[in-house]
Amino acid sequence: MPTELTLATRRSALALAQSRAFARSLEAAVPDLSLRELEVVTSGDKTQDRSLQDIGGKGLFIKELEEALLDRRADFAVHSIKDVPAEIAPALCLACIPAREDPRDALVTRSGALLAELPAGARVGTSSLRRAVALREARPDLVIEPVRGNVDTRLRKVFDGVFDAVVLALAGLKRLGLEARATEVLSPEVSLPAIGQGALGIECRTADDSVRDVLGTLADAETTICVSAERAVMAAVEGSCRTPVAAYAVRDGGALWLRALLAEPDGSRLRRAERRLSWPGNTREAERLGADLGAELKKG
């Protein structure tokens, strides 16, 4: 059992907050374990003036972290799992998906108005095609405009008057201690969460069995089942940041309830689907459910 490991993390305030929270939990769960931190600036962090669709997608937020694993500068990396593509390098694996934070979206408005109360023509910032589709469906009279930058930057653009509102992940606000900034938490019926939203993915080298065992200490079985189903939808529809796609799985009594949606990049041809399955005994069953639902949406 290793006693000293290095974790790789992005340098943003949110990435550091969630990485350090995971590190504290892991050190508390594994006696005599000591963790070092390697801060990495990713390609996605370097380019803030263009949309993710233009610069190559969400994989840009993990590329340099994976390089740190492959060249052995780090033993594991902490990701927001919604930034992790369906396919990762063969030499790497997702060794742990810890318990999930609240996956819902949050609306932050300057005036304190709820989504239904924003005036026609109000400017709402989001660079997520998924969120843009949800906003246009709920309020076609709003003006949806792209916004990049970290959480603080996006909030500042609201309170400086650049936007009337922005939509952010509630999990990110919570991890930064900014939950009180949320004017309204959007229900999944209004804004179906992004695939894996609110969950972390802990990645390491596939061959490092001892590291995988240590990381697995914090794996949450229910979150792993749910996120596996959601990620299977993404793989089936070949989803990326260029595709408005969402999937959200929850445990509903004794069943796994999976909801998903898919649209064209311009928001047209929006289709929704959902399925239930007796709570699966392993991730393969959850992945089959997600793959079947994704195939249904893709045929659409």
From Swiss-Prot:
Anything else known: The porphobilinogen subunits are added to the dipyrromethane group.
Gene3D superfamilies in alphabetical order: Periplasmic binding protein-like II, Porphobilinogen deaminase, C-terminal domain
Pathway: Porphyrin-containing compound metabolism; protoporphyrin-IX biosynthesis; coproporphyrinogen-III from 5-aminolevulinate: step 2/4
The encoding gene: hemC
Cofactor notes: Binds 1 dipyrromethane group covalently.
SUPFAM superfamilies linked to this entry: Periplasmic binding protein-like II (SSF53850), Porphobilinogen deaminase (hydroxymethylbilane synthase), C-terminal domain (SSF54782)
Name the record gives this protein: Porphobilinogen deaminase
Pfam families for this protein: Porphobil_deam, Porphobil_deamC
One MF term in the entry's GO annotations: hydroxymethylbilane synthase activity
